[in-house]
From Swiss-Prot:
Cofactor list: Mg(2+)
Pfam families: ACPS
Compartments, record wording: Cytoplasm
This protein's name: Holo-[acyl-carrier-protein] synthase
Catalyzed reaction equations: apo-[ACP] + CoA = holo-[ACP] + adenosine 3',5'-bisphosphate + H(+)
Role, per record: Transfers the 4'-phosphopantetheine moiety from coenzyme A to a Ser of acyl-carrier-protein.
GO biological process: fatty acid biosynthetic process
Binding site for Mg(2+): 9, 58
EC class name: transferase
Gene: acpS
Principal subcellular localisation of the protein: cytoplasm
Alphabetical list of SUPFAM superfamilies matching this protein: 4'-phosphopantetheinyl transferase
Length: 127
């Protein structure tokens, strides 16, 4: 195994809360996939959920070396959870193409939050 990408992002949860208060679900609909959006809508702390997913997708885009744009969109990065609750990451479309370009085969992700911040780190590995 070799590491072919590493990205970290931190988000101030209050900024996401303020954005949601101003614009409703506009940011969520831009950032989240349909499956993630369904969880967001039903979540007891939707702004916190959105902040963690935003940080995770930004970290993934940094690990891919593109940021959001340049062929990779938020919609190409899917964040889920195992039955035990551990976060998972899956790439499609432009993000999958970029992962293949890097000879990457798998992404590892860690997401954490506390009162004010959400943070995520993504490591991409090759065989």
């Amino acid at each position: 195994m070799a590491i072919v990408g590493l990205g970290t992002d931190i988000v101030e949860i209050e900024r996401i809360e303020a954005h949601v208060a101003r614009s409703g679900d506009k940011l969520a609909r831009r950032v989240l996939t349909e499956a993630e959006l369904a969880i967001y809508i039903a979540h007891s702390q939707p702004s916190r959920y959105l902040a963690k997913r935003f940080a995770a997708k930004e970290a993934a885009a940094k690990a891919l070396g593109t940021g959001i744009g340049r062929g990779v969109s938020f919609q190409h990065i899917h964040i889920g959870n195992t039955p035990d609750g551990a976060p998972t990451i899956r790439f499609t479309d432009g993000a999958q193409q970029r992962l293949a370009f890097l000879n990457g085969i798998f992404g590892h992700i860690s997401i954490a939050d506390e009162k004010s911040y959400a943070i995520a780190t993504v490591i991409l590995e090759s065989c």
